[in-house]
């Protein structure tokens, strides 16, 4: 018998994750669609693949799983407000957010992010109430800084144990 939903949510809160914004251009309108995630991972070195998961019932779901390309911006510790902005439902976001455009693939990227990754959508897998989106990395750059992390429903940063 599967575990309860409450216990499963507690497990998720017990796991720290790097915070990223994944974004694309909507096919019909060319509007930028993006969301905050902590499910981004590198998947393969040969070929260079990355992946993230997205819930089926989010407003960004359809454009994100049908896009041909997407950008991933790993946020730095000073970009908490950007993470909060893209964690809100699309209809509640209000203000326009500035973006860089990918140098190789036309994808939206967050300026001054810890890293920016330009991807072509490789595969989309359905699993439970999520889709797993796999991207082929066409270009990437690291810009330096400290990562923004998410743990226990809070944003924070990394502190090495040796520094305590």
Name each model-derived stretch.
Residues 1-164:
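Basic, polyanion-binding surface patches
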């Amino acid at each position: 018998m599967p575990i309860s939903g409450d216990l499963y949510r507690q497990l998720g809160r017990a796991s720290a994750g790097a915070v990223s914004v994944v974004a694309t251009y909507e096919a019909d309108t060319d509007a930028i669609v993006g969301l905050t995630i902590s499910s981004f991972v590198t998947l393969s070195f040969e070929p260079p693949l990355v992946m993230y998961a997205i819930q089926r019932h989010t407003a960004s779901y359809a454009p994100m799983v049908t896009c041909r390309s997407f950008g991933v911006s790993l946020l730095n510790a000073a970009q908490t407000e950007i993470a909060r902005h893209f964690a809100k439902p699309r209809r509640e976001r209000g203000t326009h957010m500035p973006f860089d455009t990918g140098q190789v693939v036309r994808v939206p990227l967050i300026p001054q992010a810890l890293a920016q990754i330009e991807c072509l959508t490789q595969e989309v897998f359905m699993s439970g109430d999520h889709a797993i989106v796999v991207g082929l990395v066409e270009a990437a750059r690291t810009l330096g800084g400290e990562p923004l992390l998410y743990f226990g429903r809070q944003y924070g940063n990394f502190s090495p144990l040796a520094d305590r």
